[in-house]
């Protein structure tokens, strides 16, 4: 019982830390709305550097064996290919939102995400909602409607962020690999596409400069 309580408390602290960091992200990304590159190149850069630092952290971690073992498991690779796609879409939408004046929409998306995860847990894994969780889900739906009805349109940015991140969390829960090895595997699966896109974008930029 004490072990369960400790794990719950630790999970809560980790979650609060993650959302505090995410809450500060706009302070870093928003100034880049004046940069001569779009969200697509920002995403590619983020993938490249995430892969580099993730591999570095794994090199000094005891979970290297789990990571290398995963490469020989096609089902695991397939699950992480799906999770990599989901998180790449999530990052792309988020970067576009922050650099195009949709900070509040992005914030709403990540506000609703934990509640959407609760709903997925109920529907997919059969987890039971207590009264507080059910009330939180209802309040989230009311909050979305409260923001959407006055402007006469659906908050697509928030909904897409919620959906992509929720599906990402669902796939990661199904994948039999720890957080750090999973992050390394995801970023390495995305790395070839990101690197190829950066090379393509750089060539396009050089061609435009040569024309000018």
Regions found by a protein language model. Name each.
Residues 27-39, 66-68, 99-102, 142-145, ...:
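Membrane-interface helix termini and inter-helical loops of multi-pass transporters
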Residues 32, 42, 97-98, 123-125, ...:
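Hydrophobic/aromatic residues within transmembrane alpha-helices
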Residues 34-41, 92-109, 178-180:
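Structural motif at transmembrane-helix junctions in multi-pass transporters
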Residues 65-104, 146:
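Specific transmembrane alpha-helical segments of multi-pass solute transporters/efflux pumps
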Residues 110, 126-146, 151-159, 187:
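Loop-to-transmembrane alpha-helix entry segments
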């Amino acid at each position: 019982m004490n072990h369960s309580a400790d794990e719950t408390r630790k999970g809560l602290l980790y979650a609060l830390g993650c959302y505090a960091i995410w809450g500060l992200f706009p302070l870093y990304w928003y100034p880049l709305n004046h940069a001569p590159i779009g969200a697509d190149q920002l995403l590619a850069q983020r993938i490249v550097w995430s892969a580099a630092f993730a591999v570095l952290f794994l090199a000094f971690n005891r979970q290297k064996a789990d990571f290398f073992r995963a490469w020989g498991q096609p089902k695991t690779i397939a699950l992480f290919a799906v999770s990599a796609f989901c998180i790449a879409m999530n990052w792309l939408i988020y970067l576009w939102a922050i650099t195009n004046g949709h900070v509040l929409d992005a914030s709403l998306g990540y506000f609703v995400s934990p509640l959407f995860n609760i709903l997925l847990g109920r529907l997919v894994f059969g987890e039971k909602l207590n009264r507080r969780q059910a009330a939180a889900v209802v309040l989230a739906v009311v909050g979305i409607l409260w923001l959407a009805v006055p402007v006469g349109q659906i908050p697509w940015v928030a909904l897409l962020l919620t959906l992509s991140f929720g599906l990402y969390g669902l796939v990661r829960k199904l994948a039999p690999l720890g957080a750090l090895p999973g992050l390394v595997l995801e970023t390495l699966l995305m790395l070839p596409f990101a690197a190829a896109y950066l090379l393509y974008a750089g060539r396009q930029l050089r061609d435009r400069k040569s024309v000018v």
